[in-house]
Amino acid sequence: MSASCGPLGTSLTQEILSSLGLADKTAAWGTLGTLRTFLSFSVDKDVQRLLKAIAGQGVDYDTIVDVLTNRSREQRQLISRAFQERTKQDLLKSLQAALSGNLEKIVVALLQPAAQFDAQELRTALKTSGSAEDVALEILATRAAPGLQACLAVYKHDFQVEAEEDIRTETNGILQDLLLALSKGDRESYSGIIDYNLEEQDVRALQQAGESSTAGQWVLLLTQRSPEHLIRVFDQYRRCTGQELEDAIRNCFHGDAQLALISLASMLRNTALYFANKLHQALQETEPNFQVLTRVLISRSESDLLSIRAEFKKKFGKSLYSSLQDVVRGDCRSALLALCRAEDI
């Protein structure tokens, strides 16, 4: 099948219109996250509030949630260090002793450095049968380069083994190829300049790879090209072939290989929509999947959770906040709602 299908570049008007999606626009407060640096931050006051919350007759869950879900991760780390200095106690261990269940897990995730949290999630995914193609791909494909490097460094330190070695041991086939390529952190950064020649070249390469059902080219492009470039390639692939890239993957691959390639393509095509789907799926299970809810809401709270909320409401006709309210019960409910932050009208 030929890749010759008319001009690759859309018109200037189309380029401008395609950039106006609400889910891609930075909020008025300068971030697409729901959680930002707390401007009236006082580490001493927060330490005292947390100490009082766990030192009385009963645990003050509301205060713990209020403090930890209204401070940035950097501020939470400052609170942890200050708590240790002033009380000679470890804040994380103190809160673990006072809490239990899903709220305890959420608080632990909130107090861990991002790299440590990701490293533990990655390790669990690789060591748990059936989840590697999901969580491991998510972590390796959606973290910015500095965060990915930090995660892999912590992984080696905490588990005394390179993540790459665990990937080789615990996975196989195309999934292994994808994870190994992503773990190298070689994805190109977007220069802001559209390379139409490279776009055409990549469309041709994917068409040829689809005709021969070989995985090498798919792995190479999906793990090395920038997401911004790949989105254009995906769109042009559809215009040239009459089918979405994901449909081509379904026709060429089966089983774990198909799942892994489609998952990665979905993350790259629209990261916010991918996470909206993950959250919706977690809420639709017989019991809410708190591991997924916790990982996504915390890891995206300072980057793009507003975008995820917008995609969730657009696709499912109901806000993420209302969905959490309707499904989640128990002490952890207020923490998850606080991370989500607000209703979407």
Swiss-Prot record:
<dbReference type="InterPro" id="IPR018252">
    <property type="entry name" value="Annexin_repeat_CS"/>
</dbReference>
<dbReference type="GO" id="GO:0005829">
    <property type="term" value="C:cytosol"/>
</dbReference>
<dbReference type="GO" id="GO:0062023">
    <property type="term" value="C:collagen-containing extracellular matrix"/>
</dbReference>
<dbReference type="GO" id="GO:0015464">
    <property type="term" value="F:acetylcholine receptor activity"/>
</dbReference>
<dbReference type="Pfam" id="PF00191">
    <property type="entry name" value="Annexin"/>
</dbReference>
<dbReference type="InterPro" id="IPR001464">
    <property type="entry name" value="Annexin"/>
</dbReference>
<dbReference type="GO" id="GO:0005509">
    <property type="term" value="F:calcium ion binding"/>
</dbReference>
<feature type="repeat" description="Annexin 4">
    <location>
        <begin position="270"/>
        <end position="341"/>
    </location>
</feature>
<dbReference type="GO" id="GO:0005543">
    <property type="term" value="F:phospholipid binding"/>
</dbReference>
<dbReference type="GO" id="GO:0005544">
    <property type="term" value="F:calcium-dependent phospholipid binding"/>
</dbReference>
<comment type="function">
    <text>May act as a low affinity receptor for acetylcholine.</text>
</comment>
<protein>
    <recommendedName>
        <fullName>Annexin A9</fullName>
    </recommendedName>
</protein>
<comment type="similarity">
    <text>Belongs to the annexin family.</text>
</comment>
<dbReference type="GO" id="GO:0098609">
    <property type="term" value="P:cell-cell adhesion"/>
</dbReference>
<keyword id="KW-0677">Repeat</keyword>
<dbReference type="InterPro" id="IPR009116">
    <property type="entry name" value="ANX9"/>
</dbReference>
<feature type="repeat" description="Annexin 2">
    <location>
        <begin position="113"/>
        <end position="184"/>
    </location>
</feature>
<feature type="repeat" description="Annexin 3">
    <location>
        <begin position="197"/>
        <end position="266"/>
    </location>
</feature>
<dbReference type="GO" id="GO:0001786">
    <property type="term" value="F:phosphatidylserine binding"/>
</dbReference>
<keyword id="KW-0675">Receptor</keyword>
<feature type="repeat" description="Annexin 1">
    <location>
        <begin position="41"/>
        <end position="112"/>
    </location>
</feature>
<keyword id="KW-0041">Annexin</keyword>
<dbReference type="InterPro" id="IPR018502">
    <property type="entry name" value="Annexin_repeat"/>
</dbReference>
<dbReference type="GO" id="GO:0009986">
    <property type="term" value="C:cell surface"/>
</dbReference>
<dbReference type="GO" id="GO:0045202">
    <property type="term" value="C:synapse"/>
</dbReference>
<comment type="subunit">
    <text>Homodimer.</text>
</comment>
<dbReference type="InterPro" id="IPR037104">
    <property type="entry name" value="Annexin_sf"/>
</dbReference>
